[in-house]
Amino acid sequence: MSPAQTEARSNIQQREMATATIRAMEGEGNERRFTLSFSSEEPYERFWGIEILDHSEGAVDLTRLNEIGVLLFNHDRDAVIGKVLRAWLENNRCHAEVEFDSDEQSEIIYQKVRSGTLKGVSVGYRIDTIEEVMAGKTTADGKFTGPAEVVRKWWPYEISIVSIPADSTVGVGRAIEKINCRTPIEVYERQLQINKNTI
């Protein structure tokens, strides 16, 4: 591993996106099935800086989604509304085929997706390895320019239909973070200056 690469945070991350790329599948027996994109290489602003999910071959481990993937509502582990039938990587995006359950809670969300009221999609994922890229520098493969943290190895573990999306490049996509509110960098810079003046 190069000096620029570090073992990433062990905490769980989420990204939400909004797009018109959630599509109902056609044909008999597919009434509750949709295809969607759930992640891309679109830069995403975290409170610590810009994060980019690498979608190169081998960067994304889709094993867990393909084996036991679930469809949630707003990342709520108690709101399982369906299952992931298959997930795949294509054209620097992750896609999935999902199927909604038929219980009462799932039916409400299914109808809202079907009618176009809900268009937001989000992915919950864990990071294995990142490459830190300083401002004006490029990644080792020349693909991305800093400042950014490029997530080189990561694995998604759930897909969510979300109410409030933040990234408009995928869909049903990315959503506004519930836990990590985005604070402008100026706030942190001011706090650093205050701390320097009081020490």
Go through each PLM region and give its residues.
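Terminal short linear interaction segments
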Residues: 180-199
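Signature of dsDNA virion morphogenesis modules
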Residues: 1-184
